[in-house]
Amino acid sequence: MSSTPVDAHQPLQAVHADARPWETLRWPGQWSKMLFHPRPERPTEPNAGLVRYEPGSHHPFHKHDFAQVWYILEGEFRIGEATYGPGTMLFYPDPHFEPPLSTATGGLMLFVQYQGPDTGGRPIYDGRFNMTARKPVEQENVER
């Protein structure tokens, strides 16, 4: 049983995916609906939502100091040297290197990115998931 007083507990929050628009993600052919994301008043809230991949979309090798879990809902993805399909869950502990990803089929994934328990690194929302325009891939910061 928790020793936290009942009035200190936070209420459940629920968001339907249809309540959010698809937003421009930093990598070519990728779009996101982050249903939850860190905000000034809730800095430890995870990035959690959907990422849609167009056929042929990809991203390069890069690294993060936060942790994340992906669940493949649709499509096939080449991630590093392996191919994964629907029903596969992937876990990236913190810190981690994220290998190149590509998809010929396109697809859909559930993403949950959260503060790394080892590094304390927090997921980044602004300027990555809610972009008005993409930069060329070679101008993206692959160090975060």
Predicted regions and their residues:
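Conserved short histidine dyad/triad with adjacent acidic residue
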Residues: K33-P38, E45-K63, A82, P93-F97
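Residues that flank catalytic or metal-binding motifs in active/ligand-binding sites
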Residues: W31, N47, Q68, T105
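A short, N-terminal "cap"/entry segment at the start of jelly-roll beta-barrel domains
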Residues: M1-T44, D126-R144
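Glycine- and acidic-residue-biased ligand/ion/polar-headgroup-sensing regions
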Residues: P55, H64-I79
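Short, well-ordered beta-strand segments in beta-rich or mixed alpha/beta enzyme
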Residues: G49-Y53, L73-G75, L108-V112
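Conserved metal-binding segment of the jelly-roll/cupin
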Residues: E54, T83-T105, V112-Q115
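Double-stranded beta-helix
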Residues: P99, T103-R144
